[in-house]
């Protein structure tokens, strides 16, 4: 709270996006180097918070602190990082959803969720211009909505992909992703995301699906976190240079809100008890 107030003034709660990043340690490290070590990183009006595995025991103290940090809306969103070549089975989805439901109970707030797929490349694309790549789903999305939103990505992936390949033949990420989605990838995603849609469950709002190359972060974030005490000044230990790949989620945060969990039931119970006692 003191750090954010010092950086963004007393009104930081209206300016700053708070995002919880979940998944296995290796996947999170690939997407946000140093996040596990630092536990949180801040920059560009965005705070990324380490959430760890959704199947692990949850840190109740952390979520209690988050609930107090910004009452009413403790998080703007939750990102579930998916490793390369990961098979999203119904069992994995069920485990994820149960973990997210538990976090919602601890926060008393169900935040929008983005799934973030890390993609591989057989050669380095570190100099490729980065941009946010993904699709947003409407509230209470159905399978047809997933298909439609992913299909809407294809023209831009093709146009931008051709432009990047023309500049550098090794920068083929967008072109290959578009071809993958066109050649059955969209249908597979629509089928794999069925457990996340409103027809299957109501408690976890799936907002979108993002894609990026693994380890594609800006070089400014590649700090020697293994020995942070020696290499990073105290004032910069939680500094984040937010990559352009995050801009889609950050820009989407003001357009979508989560919902409170449990509060209406608790208030109703309190009223009933007051009537009985009074």
Task: Give the label of every model feature segment.
Residues 1-278:
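Basic, amphipathic N-terminal segments
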